Amino acid sequence: MAKPTTIKIRLNSTAGTGHFYVTKKNARTMTDKMVVRKYDPVKREHVEYKEGKIK
């Protein structure tokens, strides 16, 4: 079986609230760490989320 191109990643909030999103990314085309601005429901505003490993 072939190796899958998409991998699951965890987007951790930089606000320090402990909130995270789980999403997928193409590991072949996006080789650098993903940084996205998304809504943090704990802080109730948009903050940056940085990519981390799923434990």
From Swiss-Prot:
InterPro entries: Ribosomal_bL33, Ribosomal_bL33_CS, Ribosomal_bL33_sf, Ribosomal_zn-bd
GO cellular component, one term: cytosolic large ribosomal subunit
Entry's Gene Ontology molecular function annotations: structural constituent of ribosome
Biological process according to GO: translation
Domain of life assignment: Bacteria
Coiled coil: none
Keyword line: Ribonucleoprotein, Ribosomal protein
HAMAP family in the cross-refs: Ribosomal_bL33 (MF_00294)
Protein family per UniProt: Belongs to the bacterial ribosomal protein bL33 family.
NCBIfam families found in the cross-reference section: PRK00595.1, rpmG_bact
PANTHER family, sorted: 54S RIBOSOMAL PROTEIN L39, MITOCHONDRIAL, LARGE RIBOSOMAL SUBUNIT PROTEIN BL33M
Protein name: Large ribosomal subunit protein bL33
